[in-house]
Structure formats: C-alpha cells, structure tokens
C-alpha cells in the first residue's frame, strides 16, 4: 500500500490531491470518488496542488525516493502526462498555497510570492522562521489574505493583497514556535497553535485582535490540523493524542451547550491529589467556568489514529478526516436535547453532543 505524504484541496474544495510515494491520486470530495491517478516508477511526491478542476497540477518531489529535487516546483499537465514548466529555488520547498493567479511557496526561511501565468513572475520575497512550511491563503472578490509564521518565533504575519496595494501586520500569537495554522472561508478569522499544543487561539485577521482562545488540554502534544466550519461557528482541532476537539466560536449558546453534569475533562485528572477536597473543588469551579465561556470542547472524539493529514468540513456538521495510511472517515456531528435539566447558575436547556460514523474506507 502506498504511503500518503500530504493531502491538499483545490481552490473551491471540490477535489483533493493526494501526494504518494508512488505518484498521485485526485478525488472528487462529495461524494468521494477517484477522478484521476498517476503512478511513477522513478520516485514520489511530497506535495500535489490542483488548479480548480483542470488538468494542471503543481508537484514537488518527496518521500523516500523523490521524483524531483525538493527545491523544484513542477507544473504538470495531466492530459499530456508531462511537465510543462518548472521553477528551481535555492531552498527546499516545504509548503504551497495557490489560488490560480497567486502562488505562495513556503521554505524554512522565506516566503516567495509569484504571479502564476505563462511565466512565473516573482512578486515578493519575505523572510520567515518557518521550518514546517506553514502557509494559509484565502481569496475573495476584494482581496487575498495570506498568513504564515513571521521572522520572530511565535509571531504571525498577515498579508492582505488588493488590486493596487498590500497591507501587512504582525500578530504576537504564541510564546513558542507556531505548529499549525487555519484560516476561515472568508479570511476574517485565523486559528493558531504552538508546539506546546495546549492552547488554540483565534484571531481577527484584519485587526490582529484575539477573538478567543480554547484549551485543548493540559498535556503538551502536536496539533496537526485546524479547520473552521463553513459558517465559521465551529473550529475543529486534531492532535497526535488521537483526538478531535470541536469548539464553538460563540461562547455557549443554547444550540451548542455542553452537559455540565458529565465527567470532568480527562486532562484535568492530572491535577487530582491526596490533599483532596479544596484542590478538586478548585478545578471543578474552573472547569465550569470554561464551559460557561465556551472554552471547553463541545465534541471530543477519539480518532482512528494520530496525526491525520487532512481535516475538512463537508458542510456545517460533517467532517472528512484522512490519515497517512490512506484510511479516511466521515463523521456527522449531532446535538440532541437531554431529558434531564441541570441547575447551574440558571435553569437552561441542556444538549448532548455526539456523532455518527457515516463512512470509512481507504484512498489507496
């Protein structure tokens, strides 16, 4: 079975490209269906990006035996079955963002912006501190928003590209290195996490202000995927703890409430001690405050395995998860009204948060 290196979406999220040690596969997302595939006998790929639903793909060599040097970007025509253009950099390519007209190439120390057309014309080159090649891009009618780690550890740099000018800002997001980024469909919100993996922070991309923050847990771990729901009301977070956390971005409205009577969040159990009652009471009060402020995950789901390579919302309540071993799951989130009422501050309607497994299978 082929190993998946990365999975990426096309510009309208109607298709996904799977980079393999043996080539690539292109899938229609909803319903999930294989549309094209190419197997290479001489090496694998680390990145595959599709231009909308066309035959044009961007390829970067990778895996155990790279087909191309990792500092080369290949523009591939799937109909002609050959490269039609290539771009060679002095740095290994770590990540790519592409909206059809603007191409952002992330390396460990630089972000290159190219105009995509008959010729790849360099527009800008910015210094970064970005060992993972993190980069997120959204293009609307008015502008293009790009976010990536800045030169200083823990900072985000946000670019807004308009037709006639560019705005840029720096956000001091975390104390340690940024490990994961997400951007909302409109580009108005940015999600970030650091290598600690305990806090997820949401930012207003235009003002740089922090909208809210969520605690994934108290144990350090790597957050590998962050994704906003299409309506930007929920944020999904997947980590190497083999868990999927889903938070509400609007506190705890009646339609998205957590049962206050359920067992405490498992990470809090680390703080239990033999000094007993005062300590436990303190953490119980703290957890209830987290629930009230919406900072506790409404859904906490055990994943098939750790470190998924794609987390994508198919609609406001359905999530597609793809894993490195080519397995995938489709989860439908549910909210059911509880039969019991709980007294906490004021009487309120309680809801139970659950999910159903709609589909699972393999991409290879």
Swiss-Prot record:
* Phenotype upon gene inactivation: Impairs atg8-processing.
Give the family, as the similarity comment puts it: Belongs to the WD repeat PROPPIN family.
GO terms classed as biological process: autophagy of mitochondrion; glycophagy; macroautophagy; nucleophagy; pexophagy; protein localization to phagophore assembly site; protein transport
Q: How does it sit in the membrane?
A: Peripheral membrane protein
Q: What does this protein do?
A: Involved in mitochondrial or peroxisomal functions and amino acid signaling pathways.
Name of the protein described by the UniProt record: SVP1-like protein 2
Top-down, what is the taxonomic lineage of the species of origin? Answer: Eukaryota, Fungi, Dikarya, Ascomycota, Taphrinomycotina
What remark about domains does the record contain? May contain a beta-propeller domain involved in specific binding to phosphatidylinositol 3,5-bisphosphate (PIP2), leading to the association of the protein to the membrane.
**Primary location recorded for the protein, binned into one broad class:** membrane
Name the GO cellular-component terms.
cytoplasm; cytoplasmic vesicle membrane; cytosol; fungal-type vacuole; Golgi apparatus; phagophore assembly site; phagophore assembly site membrane; vacuolar membrane
* Source organism superkingdom: Eukaryota
Q: Does the keyword Membrane apply?
A: yes
- Which locations, inside or outside the cell, does it occupy? Vacuole membrane; Cytoplasmic vesicle membrane; Preautophagosomal structure membrane
Q: Which gene encodes it?
A: hsv2
Q: Name one GO molecular function term.
A: phosphatidylinositol-3,5-bisphosphate binding
Q: Repeats (WD): which ranges?
A: 173-213, 218-257
The cross-references to PANTHER family, in alphabetical order and at most eight, read: WD-REPEAT PROTEIN INTERACTING WITH PHOSPHOINOSIDES WIPI -RELATED
- Could you list this entry's UniProt keywords, alphabetically sorted: Cytoplasmic vesicle, Membrane, Protein transport, Repeat, Transport, Vacuole, WD repeat
């Amino acid at each position: 079975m082929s190993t998946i290196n990365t999975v990426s979406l096309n510009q309208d999220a109607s298709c996904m490209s799977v980079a393999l040690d043996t080539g690539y596969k292109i899938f229609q997302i909803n319903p999930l269906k294989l549309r094209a595939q190419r197997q290479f006998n001489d090496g694998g790929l680390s990145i595959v990006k599709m231009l909308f639903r066309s035959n044009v793909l961007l390829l970067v060599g990778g895996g155990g035996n790279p087909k191309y040097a990792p500092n080369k970007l290949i523009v591939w025509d799937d109909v002609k079955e050959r490269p039609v253009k290539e771009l060679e950099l002095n740095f290994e390519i770590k990540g790519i963002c592409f909206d059809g007209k603007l191409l952002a190439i992330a390396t460990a120390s630089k972000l290159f912006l190219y105009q995509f057309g008959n010729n790849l014309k360099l527009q800008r080159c910015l210094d970064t501190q970005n060992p993972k090649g993190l980069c997120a891009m959204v293009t609307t009618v008015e502008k293009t928003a790009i976010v990536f780690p800045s030169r200083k550890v823990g900072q985000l740099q946000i670019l807004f590209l308009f037709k006639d000018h560019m705005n840029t800002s720096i956000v001091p997001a975390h104390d340690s290195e940024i490990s994961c980024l997400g951007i909302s469909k409109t580009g108005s919100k940015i999600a970030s996490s650091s290598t600690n993996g305990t806090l997820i922070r949401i930012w207003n991309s235009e003002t740089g202000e922090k909208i809210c923050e969520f605690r994934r847990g108290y144990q350090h771990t790597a957050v590998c995927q962050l994704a906003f729901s299409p309506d930007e009301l929920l944020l999904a977070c997947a980590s190497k703890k083999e868990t999927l956390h889903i938070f509400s971005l609007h506190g705890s409205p009646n339609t998205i409430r957590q049962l206050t009577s359920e067992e405490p969040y498992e990470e809090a159990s680390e703080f239990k001690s033999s000094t007993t009652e005062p300590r436990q009471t303190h953490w119980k009060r703290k957890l209830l405050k987290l629930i009230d402020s919406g900072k506790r995950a409404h859904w906490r789901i055990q994943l098939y395995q750790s470190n998924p390579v794609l987390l994508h919302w198919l609609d406001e309540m359905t999530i597609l998860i793809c894993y490195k071993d080519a397995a995938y799951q489709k989860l439908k989130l549910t909210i059911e009204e509880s039969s019991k009422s709980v007294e906490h501050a004021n009487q309120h309607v309680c809801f139970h948060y659950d999910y159903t497994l709609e589909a699972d299978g393999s991409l290879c």
